[in-house]
Amino acid sequence: ALPIWNDHFYGRNGESLGALSVEELDRIRGQEKKDWSKQIVPEARIEHLDTNAISLARENYKKKMNKSYISEEVDRMTDEQFLTKLKLMINGKITNAAMLLLGNEDYDYLFKTVPEASWRVYDSKNEVSDYEIFKIPYITLSERLFGKIRNLTYRYMPNQLTLFPTETKQYDMWLLRELLNNCIAHSEYTYGGRIYLNEFEDKIILTNPGSFLPGKIEPVLNPG
């Protein structure tokens, strides 16, 4: 429950509490009412999931937990038991999260709005010179998207005391992966838009449908 004082709802604002705006309050109430990831895809069945994606999820889970007895337990589970353990299936039903992460792209029409991601590369005139659209399963989205990026190697001389140049990649792939994961986690999938990875000659811009922050970003960048 949100704290109330003097007829105002309050929420965290940095290190202190501040009165919530109507927009912020509506967003919080909306989040409390429904969680898209936990909603059921009515016509989806476990047969509509990608078996390779499920196998990858099993391996990722065992690697993350890093305990032999958990790995053995996971190996004994059926796919339904494993997905239920991860709360990707609820009462035998497929959730949006399960379909998004592990779904077979042939059945993406089972979503009310089909989730997609797109890579676009821009030339020196800021015109799209190439593109590709990516569908579910999103568990492999980062590998598929990042396989398109031209991550050039730069070589430079750090100082005059060495004969060998230092090599560095144009982009930090770990950082890009974190940014993409945030795009996936904070997308508003009910809008039906795409996640875009726009690659320019000197930068990459990631965008997603929906909004991460309420209102405009200027007050956040310039709080004074």
For each of these PLM feature ranges, what is it?
Residues A1-G224:
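Conserved N-terminal catalytic/coupling substructures associated with nucleotide/phosphate chemistry
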